[in-house]
From Swiss-Prot:
This is 4-hydroxy-tetrahydrodipicolinate reductase. One of its GO terms (molecular function) is 4-hydroxy-tetrahydrodipicolinate reductase. The keyword Repeat does not apply. Catalyzes the conversion of 4-hydroxy-tetrahydrodipicolinate (HTPA) to tetrahydrodipicolinate. Belongs to the DapB family. Disulfide bonds: none annotated. Pathway: Amino-acid biosynthesis; L-lysine biosynthesis via DAP pathway; (S)-tetrahydrodipicolinate from L-aspartate: step 4/4. NAD(+) binds at G7, A8, S9, G10, R11, M12, D33, G96, T97, T98, A120, A121, N122, M123. Its EC number is 1.17.1.8. Pfam families: DapB_C, DapB_N. It is an enzyme of class 1 (oxidoreductase). Its main location: cytoplasm. The lineage of its organism: Bacteria, Pseudomonadati, Pseudomonadota, Betaproteobacteria, Burkholderiales.
């Protein structure tokens, strides 16, 4: 599997490079970074003390010409540029970027008519199994329980709520036959009045080096149920991304997510 990594100098990019180098079925053939990165020209394995022969570059076409797959955990504007290059070179994409607009998501959908794309806000196996648990719970706590989603991430995260929190909200709303767009409440301040029982609330915490904590609270009278997932390392995301690459190796064009990759549908 000839794999290139986008955002190669970042926290997630470095974890992905390490995972690819440790996978006997994978070959690192490219490492992309932003044009103003101070790491351009450095070996992609330098932070591991390894010589890979792959240099960090901002030359999209040079990287895509070598790769069969790109793993991308960057930012929406960067990912959209990578999608255009992937279409030119017929490279399959594994996308873990969050914070897309509706228009950008439509671009991903259109690209998937020509290339295979796995797009998921969270590629951890644990999170995706948790989504199934939430669907089950929501169906049984549909009346008399208020639903709140609380997430916490490191101080550097730029979007809120997290993509994973939104995935959880969509799983719950879908199980209840609702549209998350219609029932979500993002943060509260001032005199808000009594809680509307048909809503799903979101709260975001940012601080320190928290990798990612997510709790969905079903609060009833006399009891409450909390379903929580906590990430202690990004390694689970990297391993999930490699599972997604293997999944795409046997697929043609189409837009998939980790529920497809893990056979959870």
């Amino acid at each position: 599997m000839k794999i290139a990594i986008a955002g190669a100098s970042g926290r997630m990019g470095r974890m992905l490079i390490e995972a690819v180098l440790n996978d006997s079925d994978a070959q690192l053939v490219g490492a992309l970074d932003r044009a103003d990165s101070p790491f351009l020209g450095q070996d992609a394995g330098a932070f591991l003390g390894k010589e890979t022969g792959v240099k960090l570059t901002d030359d999209l076409d040079a990287v895509f010409a070598q790769a069969d797959y790109l793993i991308d955990f960057t930012r929406p504007e960067g990912t959209i540029a990578h999608v255009a290059a992937a279409l030119r070179h017929e490279v399959k994409l594994v996308i873990g970027t969050t914070g897309f607009t509706a228009e950008q998501k439509a671009e991903l959908q259109a690209a998937a008519a020509r290339i295979g794309i796995v797009f998921a806000a969270n590629m951890s196996v644990g999170v995706n199994v948790t989504l199934k648990l939430l669907e089950f719970a929501a169906k049984h706590f549909s009346h008399g329980y208020d639903i709140e989603i609380i997430e916490a991430h490191h101080r550097h995260k730029v979007d809120a709520p997290s993509g994973t929190a939104l995935m959880m909200g969509e799983a719950v709303a879908g199980a209840l036959g609702r549209s998350l767009e219609d029932c979500a409440v993002y943060g509260r301040q001032g005199v808000t009045g009594e809680r509307d029982p048909s809503t799903i609330g979101f709260a975001a915490v940012r601080g320190g080096d928290i990798v990612g904590d997510h709790t969905v609270l079903f609060a009833g009278i006399g009891e409450r149920i909390e379903i929580t997932h906590k990430s202690s390392s990004r390694v689970s995301y990297a391993q999930g991304a490699l599972r997604a690459v293997r999944f795409l190796s046997a697929r043609g064009a189409g837009l998939f997510d980790m529920q497809d990759v893990l056979g959870l549908r």
